[in-house]
């Protein structure tokens, strides 16, 4: 008998994925992240619950002590995590979700990211500053941009931080705070995804589709499809892209933008994440339902 939670997958177009697992948070979902190496999922809900799941969707740890979490990041090796909470605070926590330290800022925090090893954390502020901190809470660098950065990602293979503003700006910095390149564009941005080696950078460009850039920030084209992408992710090699749209649809695409599968999501997507090999993705919905969709048998 089919799991009712998988029924929406069979109504899509293309190669139907298997539902590998489902998990529900106890309150509406507020944030989600995937560790590419361990396959672990970190999720937060609006009641203050912080959940760590293994790659099979099995519950590992729970912390209820961090209230009003807006964004989370879990290092690819599963060593440490970080979160923005209560608008202008960040914290760093260990594998058991025990808080190691916290910092309060005088302005709102917009984005947070952690490098693959859990050694560095970057946080962007509404003032236009982005701060790089190490795992021991020491400030490493301070960056100022012409617009506040709403999205941050560390590159895996090089010590680089890639950031994007809500509109008109994509940039790249080294870990000493030196600007490597800046690229202006003409679209609002709803999310960012990067290949592991940085050779491809994607921006969810809303009505403009998915904007593509290369390792040096040069425009590399646009992927246009039905719907208005708002959150996206890609695998390590950028061969697979997962995108959720404002119209409440989910798309699984190849690197050329060809639709491999698409369907209507039961609820608004808060975040999507793709495994490093492009075989499965995780979709976190506002209701608190988190599902892993698996195409490995279709490859």
Residue positions per predicted region:
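A short helix->beta-strand "capping" segment at the edge of beta-propeller domains
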Residues: 2-28, 56
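A short beta-strand motif characteristic of beta-propeller blades
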Residues: 18-23, 58-63, 98-103, 138-144, ...
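Beta-strand-rich domains and repeat architectures in extracellular enzymes and scaffolds
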Residues: 21-48
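Residue-level detector of Asp-centered blade-edge/turn motifs that repeat once per structural unit
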Residues: 36-38, 76-77, 116-117, 156-158, ...
